[in-house]
Every structure is written in structure tokens, then in C-alpha cells.
Design a protein with these regions (language model features):
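A short, Trp-centered hydrophobic/proline-enriched beta-strand micro-motif
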Residues: 114-127
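Cytochrome P450 C-terminal beta-domain/meander region
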Residues: 131-147
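Flexible, small-/acidic-enriched active-site or ligand-binding loops
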Residues: 134, 152-155, 175-207, 211-213
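N-terminal glycine-rich flavin-associated loop
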Residues: 85-103
Length: 369
């Protein structure tokens, strides 16, 4: 596997870096009304205006027809900047799955170049990314009726459409459709999130995507999640390295102390390992290969190791790490939200253990305890 960025990936990274330099600072985000969801609407508009949101779209919609490998690079840059915008949700949870599943997808994508948000309802109560969702989609005349309950639906209130995994496939639902109830839920980063109740929500036949749609959505979502998480790890490590190189104690930078330098090194290894896992997952998906193991390994590393690195980096900042006008807390809080979205370390280890047991032809149960 060649880890050198292609010319397209390098161009995406350069464009993303340039646009993300205008992201709202931690101080600016802290000044927003924190009784409401907090996200960078100004940056989101610029991402649309600069064509960043159109990168994976078909040429018929003015896009560049790029895939998960290039979107993964973009999300890594979003993570490095700790930008509070729904690029992950719109491209990773929405555009890429819709394009992969085909059908009548373009009608749901038409508003994305102008800044429409897409998202997915990946989790159910007590069941993160379930392979067999409890939410149902029952045939009714020339359409379907969707009933169920989803949790941790990011940017649901702001979205034009939500991809909803069901027993029959992935339903594309408008969040303001009759029968949909959204209830705001708390996030560590204060980014928008809701519980989504669906009570007999009608959709037309073209709004139900089948053919292994739930697994396709989950694989792309996990690869995208891991890419952004890798960027968060890299961004926090870089911020910490800069801090410990300039913060002096006992007459010299604290980076000169072995205990500090070892913790920075540990954080670096965590971020690079997650980047490797995410890159591998994106590459396999882009090549049409089985990426189940790669996405599950990346999700486990995200859930198990990235929070430890974030805690270490925050600790090395001292009291500054808890200052909401300083960027360190953004990386930590966004990481907490992503860990919760994938289900936490015990859940991910159980999934990974079951996958290994299946490959070995044995039954097994795993726990991180």
C-alpha cells in the first residue's frame, strides 16, 4: 500500500487547509450563545462557496466526482483544525453513501453545493451502528412507513435529509416530515445533536435504499469518522508539542523533561496509528475491497486510545487545557462526541472480537474489562 498522497488528494489537502484557516477560533466559539447548539456557520458557507462540499458530487451537479480516499484527506484536515462544521455528516454520512447506493440519489444531493446539510441516524438506544436495526420500514401502498427511535443524530435539526437505517434498508427522511420528532441532546462540544423519533413516517419507494445499504452506510461512516478523528489527534499533538516547547519551568522548556517528551511521543504514536488505520479503511473502500476489519480496527483505536492521548495532552497544558478560549478543549470535546457515536471502547472491542471469532470459526465474547 502506497501512503503517498495522489495529486488529487494533495490538491484537496491544500484547498482544505486554505479554507480552514478561516475557522472560528476557540475564543469566538466560546463567545457564542452556549445555551444553543454551537457551530461555525460562517465557515460552512465558505466551504460551500469555495466548492469544497462539491468535491465528491457528480459532474452533473458541478462536482469533481472524488471518492472516500479524497474525502478522508479532507476530513483529516477538518479534524486538525478542530473545525465545528458538518463536513463529516454531509459528505461522510450523506453524499458518499447516497452515491454508493445509487438509485434516485441525485434528488437528495442537489442542495449540497449551496450548503444543504445531510446526516445519518447511525445509533439506536443501547445499540451503536446496529447491523440489524430495530427501526422498521413497512411497505404501504406505493411507499413505506418508517417507525423507530434513533439517538445521537448529529445536525438533525439543520439537515435537509437524514439517512435512517431500518430493517428494510436505508430510508432517506426529511427531518421536518410528519411523524418526525426531534429532541435536542447534549454534546461535549455543544455541536448540534438530537434524538429522532419516527412515528409512521411515510416515504416514497425511491427514498428506501436497499442492496446491503445499512452495511455500506456503516462502513463509509466509520472510515469517515476515523479520518476526522485522526486529524483531531494530529492537531492536538501539534498544539501540545508547540506548548511544551515554549512553556518554561525550572529555567527550561518542559519538553526537555523526559516524562513530558514521552507523553507527547505516545500521543504522536496514537494519532499516526489511527491515521494509518483510517487511510487503510478509506483505500480499501475506494478500491472496492472488503473493509470490514479495517473500519472496525480504526473505530476501536478511536474509542480506546484517542481519549487517552487527549487526556495526556490536556494534562500537559495544565490549567490552560480547560480554558474554553484556547483550542485544546475543542479537540478533546469533539473526540468525546465521536467516541460516544461509535459506541465506546468496550462496544468496539466486542465487535472486533466477534469479527475475529467469525473468521476463526469459533464463538467468543470480548470485554475491555
Amino acid at each position: 500500500m502506497d501512503f503517498t498522497l495522489s495529486s488529487e488528494q494533495q490538491a484537496v489537502a491544500e484547498v482544505a487547509t486554505a479554507v480552514l484557516q478561516t475557522a472560528a477560533s476557540a475564543e469566538a466559539l466560546a463567545a457564542m450563545d452556549r445555551s444553543s447548539p454551537v457551530w461555525d456557520t460562517t465557515l460552512w458557507k465558505r466551504l460551500a462557496d469555495e466548492g469544497v462540499l462539491s468535491l465528491p458530487l457528480p459532474s452533473s451537479l458541478g462536482g469533481d466526482e472524488l471518492g472516500i480516499a479524497e474525502v478522508g484527506v479532507l476530513l483529516d484536515q477538518v479534524g486538525r483544525a478542530a473545525a465545528q462544521v458538518p463536513v463529516l455528516e454531509t459528505l461522510g454520512f450523506g453524499v458518499l453513501p447516497l452515491l454508493a447506493l445509487g438509485g434516485d440519489a441525485q434528488r437528495f444531493l442537489a442542495g449540497v453545493p449551496g450548503g444543504d446539510i445531510l446526516t445519518a441516524a447511525l445509533d439506536e438506544p443501547g445499540a451503536p451502528l446496529p447491523a440489524q436495526p430495530a427501526t422498521t420500514a413497512a411497505a404501504d401502498g406505493d411507499g413505506y412507513v418508517v417507525t423507530g427511535r434513533k439517538v445521537a443524530v448529529r445536525y438533525a435539526e439543520q439537515a435537509a435529509y437524514v439517512l435512517v437505517p431500518t430493517t428494510a434498508g436505508v430510508a432517506v427522511v426529511a427531518p421536518d416530515a410528519p411523524g418526525v420528532t426531534l429532541t435536542r441532546t447534549f454534546t461535549a462540544s455543544l455541536a448540534p445533536e438530537c434524538t429522532m423519533a419516527l412515528d409512521g413516517v411515510r416515504i416514497d419507494s425511491g427514498a428506501l435504499l436497499t442492496g446491503g445499504a445499512v452495511d455500506v452506510l456503516h462502513r463509509l461512516a466509520l472510515a469517515a469518522l476515523s479520518s476526522q478523528a485522526a486529524g483531531l489527534g494530529t492537531g492536538m499533538t501539534n498544539l501540545t508539542a508547540q506548548h511544551v516547547s515554549t512553556r518554561e519551568q525550572f529555567g527550561k522548556p518542559i519538553a526537555a523533561f523526559q516524562a513530558v517528551s514521552q507523553q507527547v511521543a505516545d500521543s504522536y504514536v496514537t494519532a499516526r496509528t489511527l491515521e494509518l488505520a483510517a487511510t487503510s479503511a478509506c483505500w480499501r473502500l475506494a478500491e472496492g475491497l472488503d473493509a470490514e476489519e479495517d473500519t472496525d480496527v480504526a473505530a476501536y483505536w478511536l474509542a480506546e486510545r484517542l481519549p487517552v492521548a487527549m487526556q495526556q495532552c490536556s494534562h500537559m497544558h495544565g490549567g490552560l487545557g480547560a480554558d474554553v478560549t484556547y483550542a485544546a478543549h475543542l479537540y478533546y470535546e469533539q473526540t468525546k462526541d465521536l467516541v460516544r457515536l461509535v459506541g465506546g471502547p468496550s462496544s468496539r472491542l466486542t465487535i472486533l472480537g466477534a469479527l475475529s471469532a467469525r473468521d476463526l470459526g469459533v464463538e467468543a465474547a470480548c470485554s475491555s474489562i
